[in-house]
Amino acid sequence: MVVYNGYQLSKRKPLIKLAQEKLDRVDFERLARTGHFLDRVEERNINLNKISSTKMKRATIYEVKLEENEIISVGIRVSYNKKQVACMIIGFKTETPMVVTSWLMERK
């Protein structure tokens, strides 16, 4: 497994484009949630219903995980409210893309 983020990711434009194409095909209104994500909803106090598909289209990719040259997950940052952004890991290892985990961060 190889993880590209930050500077490593910025040097791999084709990988970013491929990850963006995968994200564009995801129906965020019906996105499945993993058990790991569901266990932490209360703890992390995040409501995915506040994140519209329009906000998802403007999301920033900050991490891509590869396994045998296949994208297995993409990390994105998306606007949550005026003070915070939601960081999400979307997994593509199964047939249906799923939210693996997410958390809130203060805007910088």
Language-model segment annotations:
Residues 1-108:
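Ribonuclease/tRNase effector modules and their secretory precursors
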